[in-house]
Amino acid sequence: MSKLPLRDRLVVLTRPEGRGADWKDALVEAGAVVSELPLLEIKFEPDDTVLSEVLDAMGEYDWVVFTSANGVRGFFDRFFERFTDIRSVGGVRFACLGPATEKALRQYHLDSDLTATQNDALSLGRELMTKHDVENQKLLVVTGNLNTPELPRLLADGAMAIVDVIKVYATEEKSVAESPEAAEFRRRGADAIVFASPSAVESFLHQAASLRPDAGARQPKAVAIGATTADALRKAGIPLAGTASAPTAKAIRDAVVAALA
């Protein structure tokens, strides 16, 4: 691999604003010109009644399970509106889905007791059940509005755990048709466009008419962050050029390099 395998390549990231800075850094270090087209936005809107009940019961939980970095941020932002001392979490243990979630947890000076080796919620549940006895233990699953109920169901039915669920954020489509970023994308196109979730793929499809590169512009190759997003691209009929082996900046950079080789 040359020192700058992405020299002068234009790569578009579709993550929400303020997310994926390490992805951008890794791509820029490889020589890419990176632009952002945030197809989604994150809103932190937990149900206040449910959240109050959860915080009242913090000392009762054996595990808190986070499915995303957004879940970590959304939960602790509200946690510190109630408490001033991180020790108020009690003796709870933490499980995280993926390295980005683990990294977000460490920002609160907390370590993950279990981080899933694969980037899907059911793998996290199976690892938790296999490596720890959670039968009759009380678990809190912190998640968002688009997550399926499969993980809580697995833990409740498969591990016989007592499971509470709180949704602390919502992922919503962001209209970018009139944005400067969309105008630039139409004018220049891109060599690659990176999708980080099925919902980003869906948002792209809904806005496809306003995101079509002009004649003569570069036609981007689609790169997925993982298998679930790759499946969403295939189902949408978007040719898949590459899939990252893990949801990390290095793996995403390597997938883009391979797709454009």
Residue ranges and their predicted role:
Residues 1-261:
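Signature of uroporphyrinogen-III synthase
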